[in-house]
Amino acid sequence: MLNMESPQMYADAVQTLAHVDLKKQPQPLPQQATIGQITLTAMSSAQQQQQQQQQQQQQQQQQQQQQQQVTTDANNNATVQDAALLVKQHAMQQMQLSNNNSNNLLQKQMLQQYSTQTDLDELTTQEITLDLQHLIDDQFRDTETLGIFSDMVTSPGGLSATLPPSGMVSAAAKVLQQQQQTLANARQQQHSYGRAALAYMRQAVHSNATYNNHSSDENSSVGSDSSSTIKEEPIDPDYRRHLQESVTGQAAAAFINNSNGLYNAYQSNNLSNNNSSSNNSSNNSSNNSSNSNTNSTNAAQFTNLTTANVLAHHSLPHLTANTAQQLLKHHSKLQQTQQQHAQQQQQHAQQQHRKHSNKHVDKGTEEYRRRRERNNIAVRKSREKAKVRSKEVEERVKSLLKEKDALLRQLSEMTNELSLHKQIYMQLMNHTNPEVSRVCRSFLNTNEHAL
């Protein structure tokens, strides 16, 4: 047999043998043909498998390249986002630094203003010596002397004496006085000041107060005739009027209530007088005649004094006219917005009520159709009547215009006749006959008066 090295050589040998057999024998063998076909199909299938493997390898390479591109794009996007975040963080840090710097500057300015105001107050305040013996004696006088705390705010001179010269808080002080007068009756049975309460208080008590003290002690430093008066500049009436017009009662009351307890003054009126009448009755019986004579003058002794929490420019150096006005304006704006919001809500509620109050009408019923027909007929009739009226009015206007033209023509004719008559009479006046001239003059005068 033949030694075959490759399938191709085997196939060629098979074909040659087949041809030889065909030449020798007229009938071919079926087995040899099937073997050749099998070998050919095996060869083609092997080649197809190789091609499929190559295609799969190419597809895998393409997929790997696409994955690499996706990963590179994601990395690029991540780097861009990181850079944007870094820029934002840097901007936020700069904003925080600028805000901190501005806050520090504002705090420094506020401290400087406060220090300057306190320095000015220390320079402008007058030193008034206190009569301690007289103050101690005042605590055990009659019932009127113990009412100084309630009279400090409610008295007309108490607030006017402590107002600063510029009148920066006059409106707020007036509102405070009104509020305390209204709350005094409600709190009359709850609060009371004891006998041991001092007749003077700290801070802004002796800033602008006027003392009319008549001491019973001969060795006291303040005599009966000594009184310290402080002259103040008059408040500008225009400025006061402007404050009174701009400040409403509700806004000022809300401003006082919302000012973090700056105006927690003594809000009782004549409380200590009512609570200490029984205690002072025994003390008045044991006092000397000189003390009894000075009771009337000691009643209004410290009425001009103010407490530490009452509006005073010494105890509140940070409160200025501009800040008070700004707060009041802000509160008034808030009230206006609240009122507008309430009105809008009310209108909306009314509209909804009207919508719900309308009856549901079925448009498919005969009654609805009859009503619609009646309404249409009424509308048509009213339109026809309006057209007729408009035509009548137009005709009337035309007739009136014609009458006006005729009257104007008559008027022009009459004026022409009058001018002719005047010319004739003027010529006749120059006539030699005096009687004719006299008649013409009288006629002209009567015509002028008639005209």
From Swiss-Prot:
Protein name: CCAAT/enhancer-binding protein
Region entry Disordered, spans: 210-236, 267-298, 328-389
Gene: slbo
Organism of origin: Drosophila virilis
Keyword Transcription: yes
GO molecular function (one): DNA-binding transcription factor activity, RNA polymerase II-specific
PROSITE patterns named in the record: BZIP (PS50217)
Entry superkingdom: Eukaryota
Entry similarity comment: Belongs to the bZIP family. C/EBP subfamily.
Chief location of this protein within or outside the cell: nucleus
